[in-house]
């Protein structure tokens, strides 16, 4: 039995709702997508609910689900993925957080991003914190880009049900950290101590003395949120399916999810996760990786951003760019030897300007696939697709089965 | 982001099977329903299994499921809903029962409804029981309509797994109460004592002395069944979804379910839950309530009765009356600002003359809805609908998501 390779392409936030400006079509229906339409003709469509019908998914929970894990059982916060995504090496019992450098004046947060402090300044401040703050557990504090940083408390995973101190708007004092159980109460106490001591170090740091003199907002306070630890999964993707798996991703959060479950992660030059990303660089990298890997996951972010920005025409254009990315891949593989799945991690309808619980159209084409009657890729056409309405966690098993890599249960 | 309002219309027992008398159509397919057909064109259809495929649902379990609760986890008997539905104020730890006044002669139940005793006589007898029966717990005993009454044991909710003493046919002695655990064993003992003492009070009551002289069956015994307590739900509907919710209902059992989960319940003049109900009074009330409420639930009962009575043409006529009720609502709202769902709580096929486990056609139309290819509302057309085949408990999350009232899980 021939084993096929798998290509999973996630166009972030792909699904949408009918839009007047597009004549009642969705961006995917409006866009000119000859390659995806061709794949729809020779393949099979359906709708997938990333988590369950009507439930908006986050990017992290949606990817966990699409990679086959029940997010209600596996998800334990975003921080761990963010930390992996910025290149930290973590242990499974570490607890990680997203951090903002912020400005505190007279007990009130006056700027949640410390005047968008530069990456260089932030890294220097992070170093000072790492060297001078003393708390009862080992920690890693690392600057990411701009005002963003990551905090890791070693060995504190059990306390992941801890809240945040971010008031989420300027003019308010920091929140006290909340907790849901004894283990996270301990973490909350450590975080309060950490924030207090970091404030002392930051407030008198030469970089902030200089910013103060220049009239710039000082980066003298830390806002900590998004506690997260290693997802509670029975087995890493690569072990579970016995495949060599690679991901082509630019966004830290999604990189982190892919790393956490065993993918080798690549970010080709030019891939940014922003509107200006180089999708053809991703296509070339994917084709190259298909030589060595059994399963390649390609993530395309900007479709989601266009939904958040309520820009239907831009979303349609980005889908057309994604179509060209997919064409390059299709042109460089033998479709008999590959199973290609294309979907979104969730819907980000322009009218909602956020993730929604609408199902996401799904396309599977390649070797072994039973073609249905569908003619093009789109929300309405997917409703009559042969895959029916499935859950996000069904996608990978269906792919692996078409790839002839599943195992029989029973005799 | 605009938040929409929701209208959920339940045509009780709507689903049916093909009927020779209707040329092989179902009553819904046979009926002339221009408004629902219009909504099907601009909206989306599907099939919903109230509980799960092939499983007939009761009206209480079906409504619990459609309101988003798993009835296998949440349902704890019907009595509580009946008691709420007849206007009793209950605490969450109360245990309630449906009661019949019945006739006992020589140790045998000779009439399960005591000659359909009048409401006035029954209320007088109920008063005598309330005043003269002494058992080890506080109780409320209240006459409803005709031979029907309600019993509430205060604070005894834990014992809801108690059986009944109703032999369900005349000529048999009352059953002893059964039980499934220690808490319900105690309730069974209390009920045996209650029934015995009530029998003593009733048997010598002047009303029964008079009935005996007139040759009428005496109402000297109580048949107690349908033990029920507050449903085991994580949160009331109104709290869970942060909406102000109203119900337009006439039937006690469904009223009770709606009250239990936080709805304000209205029964406009003329709404009876019988064939003679005034559906236009319901429509007007619903439109009025939409000014103040975020979510309005309208229940239409007689379609179910026509199924129980195996009267296909009457069922079709009732569906046409429901269509006019829906037209009034559609004419008085802006469909861009509202999400309307129409379905049944279960199928009541004429050939079955009872609830069946057939899936129920479902229609959703209004703002944000992705239209599918369907053209009219009916069982067969629903099979190719874009909603696919979902569960009853998916309906409200899908509505709330289109109403832009859901919250993201994950980051």
Curated annotation (Swiss-Prot), chains A, B:
<comment type="subunit">
    <text>Homotetramer.</text>
</comment>
<dbReference type="Pfam" id="PF01676">
    <property type="entry name" value="Metalloenzyme"/>
</dbReference>
<dbReference type="InterPro" id="IPR042253">
    <property type="entry name" value="Pglycerate_mutase_ApgM_sf"/>
</dbReference>
<comment type="function">
    <text>Catalyzes the interconversion of 2-phosphoglycerate and 3-phosphoglycerate.</text>
</comment>
<comment type="similarity">
    <text>Belongs to the BPG-independent phosphoglycerate mutase family. A-PGAM subfamily.</text>
</comment>
<dbReference type="InterPro" id="IPR023665">
    <property type="entry name" value="ApgAM_prokaryotes"/>
</dbReference>
<dbReference type="InterPro" id="IPR006124">
    <property type="entry name" value="Metalloenzyme"/>
</dbReference>
<keyword id="KW-0460">Magnesium</keyword>
<dbReference type="GO" id="GO:0046872">
    <property type="term" value="F:metal ion binding"/>
</dbReference>
<keyword id="KW-0324">Glycolysis</keyword>
<dbReference type="GO" id="GO:0004619">
    <property type="term" value="F:phosphoglycerate mutase activity"/>
</dbReference>
<dbReference type="GO" id="GO:0006096">
    <property type="term" value="P:glycolytic process"/>
</dbReference>
<comment type="pathway">
    <text>Carbohydrate degradation; glycolysis; pyruvate from D-glyceraldehyde 3-phosphate: step 3/5.</text>
</comment>
<dbReference type="Pfam" id="PF10143">
    <property type="entry name" value="PhosphMutase"/>
</dbReference>
<keyword id="KW-0413">Isomerase</keyword>
<dbReference type="InterPro" id="IPR004456">
    <property type="entry name" value="Pglycerate_mutase_ApgM"/>
</dbReference>
<protein>
    <recommendedName>
        <fullName>2,3-bisphosphoglycerate-independent phosphoglycerate mutase</fullName>
        <ecNumber>5.4.2.12</ecNumber>
    </recommendedName>
</protein>
<dbReference type="InterPro" id="IPR017850">
    <property type="entry name" value="Alkaline_phosphatase_core_sf"/>
</dbReference>
